C-alpha cells in the first residue's frame, strides 16, 4: 500500500470512529470471476459442509478467506452469463429479460449477431434510468466508481458512470476489458489494444504499477476524501481483473510455476491473487481509518469463470461445475458472493440492526438482482419507485442472519437470445430443477430442452427430461410466463420474425 495513503489514513482515524448516521458500503466487483476461482470453498456437500476441490488448492486468496470468516458466503449465487447484463442487473435490481441488456455491450455499437433480437437494449443504461448509485446519492452518500464501467457504448450517456448517479468516476468508460494491465504499456494507450485503453490513469503510465494496484490506490484515496468530508460513501470498486488479457502480475508469479498449466492459466492465477491483495488493502485501510465496523463489504463476481482451463462446455475451468462464462451451464452463471461487515462488532448499532453471521455458508439461492434492494434498505435510500421500474431482486438480510425468507423465490432466470459459448437459450432454475430451452432459430420448429436435478447432479452430466417430463413441462410453463411478464425480447428466424418459446416443445 502507498505510504502516503497510510499516513493520511492514520491522521483521519481519530475523527472517523464516532458513530455515523448511515453505514458505508463497499461493493467489490471482480470481472469474469467464477465461484471456483478462489481458495475459498463455496460449494458444499449434502449437509452444507464446504468441500475443497483441486481448483481451490491452485488459487491463493487469503483475503477472501479472511472476509468469508467474517461474514456469509453463498454456495448458490447467480449472475447473468456475461458482463453488461450482470452490471445492469446490479445497478437496477432487474433481470436481463426485463432490462433487455441481454448481451455484452460493444463500445463501437450494436453487436447483434445473425439471429439475435433486433430490439435488445444494446445502448445500455442512460441518464434517465433509476440506478442504485443514483438512489444512494440522493440519500446523501458520496458515490464513487473506480474501475470497469461497461454500461453503455461509446458516445452514449451511460458511457460515463457519472451520468448513472456516481459523483466520482475513475477509469470507467464503455470498454469491457483493458488494453493492458501493465503501467509500462499505459494500460493499453502506449502498447497493447489501444481501443481498449483504460482512461484516467495517466500518472501511472510508464511505471511498473499493475492496473489492479493503480485502481486500489485510487479507490483508497477517494475513501480518504469522503471520510475527511464526513460523508457516508458507496465505493463501487470494479476491477478489470480477471478479464483477459491474462498478463502476468509479477508480484505473484513465483506462486505459479507449475508448467503443467499454460502460461495463460498461470497469468490468470496471478490476476486472481492480485485482486485478492486489493481486497486486503481495502479492508486494512478501513481499519486504519477507524470505520471498519461501520462499513459493509459485498464481494461479487459478475459472471462465470473465463479461466483458460478446459473447453467451453466441459468440466474444466469451473470444475466440478460444467461450462464457463457465456455458457448455459452452472459454470457460466454461478459466482462468488461474500457479504460481511469489515469489522464484526456486536456492540455496533448498525450491526445490531443488520446482523451478519460470521464464517457461515448460505445454501439459499441468491441472485445479483438481490443486491439492489438489500443495499437500498441498509442505506435508507428506499423510496417509492416509479411503476415502470419493477424490481426482480429480494432482500438478503434474512439469509445473512441465518433465517429463511418465505418471500424470496428459489428461482433464477438466465435469458440469452444471442450467440456465445451457449447460444440462443433461456435457462430457468426453480428449486433443485433446472430447465434449459434452446430456441434453435435456424430451425425454429425444432426447439430442444434439457432438464437437470442440481441437487443430485450439480455437474449437469445427466439430462433427466425423459424421466421427469411433467416437471419439465411445469418449468417450461413457468419460464414462458416469466418471459411474458418481463416483456422479453427473443431471437429471430431467417425471415427476421421473433422465435418465441413453445409450450409444446416437451411432449
Regions inferred by a protein language model and the residue ranges of each:
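A short beta-strand-to-alpha-helix junction
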Residues: 54-61, 78-82, 119-130, 205-214, ...
Amino acid at each position: 500500500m502507498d505510504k502516503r495513503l497510510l499516513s493520511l489514513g492514520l491522521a483521519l482515524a481519530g475523527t472517523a470512529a464516532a458513530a455515523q448516521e448511515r453505514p458505508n458500503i463497499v461493493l467489490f466487483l471482480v470481472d469474469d470471476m467464477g465461484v471456483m476461482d478462489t481458495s475459498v470453498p463455496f460449494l458444499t456437500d449434502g449437509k452444507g459442509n464446504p468441500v475443497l476441490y483441486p481448483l481451490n488448492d491452485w488459487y491463493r486468496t487469503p483475503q477472501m478467506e479472511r472476509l468469508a470468516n467474517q461474514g456469509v458466503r453463498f454456495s448458490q449465487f447467480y449472475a447473468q452469463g456475461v458482463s453488461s447484463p450482470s452490471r445492469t442487473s446490479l445497478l437496477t435490481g432487474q433481470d436481463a429479460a426485463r432490462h433487455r441488456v441481454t448481451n455484452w455491450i460493444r463500445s463501437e455499437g450494436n453487436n447483434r449477431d445473425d439471429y439475435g433480437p433486433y430490439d435488445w437494449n444494446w445502448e445500455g443504461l442512460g441518464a434517465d434510468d433509476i440506478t442504485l448509485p443514483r438512489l444512494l446519492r440522493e440519500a446523501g452518500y458520496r458515490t464513487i466508481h473506480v474501475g470497469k464501467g461497461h454500461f453503455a457504448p461509446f458516445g452514449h450517456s451511460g458511457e460515463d458512470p457519472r451520468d448513472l448517479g456516481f459523483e466520482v468516476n475513475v477509469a470507467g468508460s464503455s470498454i469491457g476489458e483493458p488494453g493492458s494491465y501493465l503501467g509500462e504499456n499505459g494500460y493499453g494507450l502506449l502498447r497493447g489494444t489501444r481501443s481498449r485503453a483504460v482512461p484516467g490513469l495517466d500518472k501511472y503510465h510508464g511505471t511498473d504499477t499493475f492496473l489492479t494496484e493503480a485502481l486500489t490506490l485510487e479507490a483508497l484515496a477517494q475513501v480518504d476524501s469522503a471520510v475527511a468530508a464526513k460523508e457516508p460513501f458507496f465505493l463501487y470498486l470494479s476491477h478489470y481483473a480477471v478479464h483477459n488479457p491474462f498478463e502476468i502480475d509479477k508480484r505473484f508469479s513465483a506462486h505459479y510455476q507449475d508448467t503443467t498449466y499454460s502460461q495463460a492459466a498461470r497469468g490468470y492465477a496471478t490476476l486472481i491473487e492480485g485482486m485478492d491483495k486489493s481486497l486486503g488493502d481495502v479492508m486494512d485501510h478501513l481499519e486504519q481509518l477507524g470505520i471498519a465496523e461501520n462499513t459493509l463489504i459485498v464481494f461479487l463476481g459478475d459472471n462465470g469463470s473465463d479461466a483458460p482451463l478446459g473447453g467451453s462446455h466441459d468440466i474444466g475451468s469451473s470444475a466440478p461445475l460444467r461450462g464457463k462464462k457465456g455458457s448455459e451451464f452452472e459454470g457460466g452463471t454461478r459466482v462468488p458472493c461474500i457479504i460481511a461487515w469489515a469489522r464484526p462488532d456486536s456492540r455496533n448499532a448498525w450491526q445490531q440492526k443488520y446482523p451478519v453471521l460470521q464464517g457461515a455458508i448460505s445454501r439459499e439461492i441468491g441472485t445479483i438482482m438481490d443486491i439492489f434492494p438489500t443495499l437500498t434498505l441498509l442505506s435508507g435510500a428506499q423510496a417509492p419507485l416509479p411503476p415502470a421500474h419493477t424490481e426482480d431482486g429480494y432482500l438478503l438480510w434474512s439469509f445473512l442472519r441465518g433465517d429463511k425468507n418465505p418471500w424470496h423465490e428459489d428461482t433464477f432466470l438466465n435469458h440469452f437470445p444471442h450467440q456465445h459459448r451457449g447460444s440462443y437459450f433461456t435457462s430457468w432454475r426453480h428449486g433443485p430443477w433446472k430447465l434449459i430451452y434452446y430456441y434453435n432459430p435456424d430451425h425454429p420448429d425444432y426447439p430442444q430442452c434439457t432438464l437437470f436435478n442440481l441437487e443430485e447432479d450439480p455437474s449437469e452430466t445427466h439430462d433427466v427430461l425423459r424421466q421427469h417430463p411433467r416437471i419439465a413441462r411445469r418449468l417450461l410453463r413457468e419460464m414462458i410466463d416469466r418471459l411474458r411478464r418481463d416483456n422479453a425480447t427473443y431471437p429471430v428466424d431467417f425471415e427476421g420474425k421473433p422465435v418465441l418459446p413453445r409450450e409444446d416443445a416437451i411432449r
